[in-house]
Amino acid sequence: MMESISFQVDDGHGMSRDEFISRWLVVGTESKASGLSTAKEDRNGLKVRPKLGQKGIGRLSSANLGPLCLIISKRKKCDFVVSLIDWRLFENPFLNLSDILIPVEEVQSLEQILPVAENLRIELLRNVTGHPDNDAELNTDRPELIARRERISTAWKQFDSVSESEGKSKPSSAIIDMLTELPFAPHHLSEWQVWKGESECGTALLVSGLNFDLQAQVDATQSDISAMASRTRFFETLSSFVDTYSDNFQSSSLTADPDFSYAVRVWENDSLLPKLILGSGNEFNAAKLSNIEHVIDGIFDAEGVFRGHIRAFGRDLDEECIIYPPDDLSMPVRDDGKVGPFGLYIGALEFDPKNTSLSDAEFEYFKGLAERYAGFLVFRDGLRILPYGRTDNDFFEIDERRSRNAGREFWNHRQMFGRVAISRQRNPNLKDKAGREGFLDNRAAKV
């Protein structure tokens, strides 16, 4: 069976060699914390976008897709940067971090990318075998090179021994087997805008050894429970990735349309025509909720006061609704706990058809939407924050409260659509967990 490859491509401003090493590859730099906006010449005509995520998210996300990653990046007026990484090198606890050498090269043309990747393969393999580049290095008596080779050899012997004692295969053998021959080919880059000559800049990541969740998307014929659950979770994770409530909603006045499009496609058995799994062009649009029977749409200010529009059983209240926070809620006043203003939209329908104000056709329409897209999401600056909105997440305790008192609690993830819209500028205390999904469990998140 042919090796499945995942490729992620974009037409962003790309990275030079120095930027790739200092901003993406090296751990613990200040690139995300500097607060500097992207230079105008790098925005490709787009508006200024806030920086998203935390330092290290890119590396962790790449490693989660699969162990072997070929990275190609092109910045305007710069050469192509090409690097090859096997993330399993960093799983060896006996290996010194300083002994791991990630090969990085620059090339001037597209045609040179895959040939130079072969050289990178040989260099990367040395992190496991310890073999020198050439006979001259093999015969050298430089103590530091000899010591490094010995440390690498010893580290993998120790790691292999531990794995075998646990009944597992040798980690070194798995890496060597994958690096025997690179599975990447020119057609894997055929959809990249830079490869097609449609853009002067961008980045491409080619990943091999796909994790189970991605493999389940490639082979849609898998019908076992695990594969089906993976496909469902994948859809829940990436559908509605961009805030579709950005137009004509009162709750959107604090955030801007990110002007961001995406798509996930699968080419089966090297077919010429891909199958669209999901994408911003064919996903749920909040405009479809214009006639839903219950609506809350407005803004919470920094004092916790809600001002907005209410609809109940299909009837819009004429006056603006103002709701003050409960008496037992005290808003934080310390700078590290303050919550800024944010937008809230909720659209919902009745569970029981006999209670609805909708027609039979409308009720069935919204019921069908709910089966596929219901949930309460969180967006920052127009892009979704995970895991909020997935069926396995109840951050706002909506389902928990209903399970305790179904007669009193109306809201339920299965029959509501909605989102909280925040911005990094107005809510800097709502911070992402490093390397994990969701907000840090601090005072601001609890409010």
Question: What spans do the regions from the language model cover?
Answer:
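Short secondary-structure boundary/capping segments
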Residues: 24, 85-88, 220-224, 280-282, ...
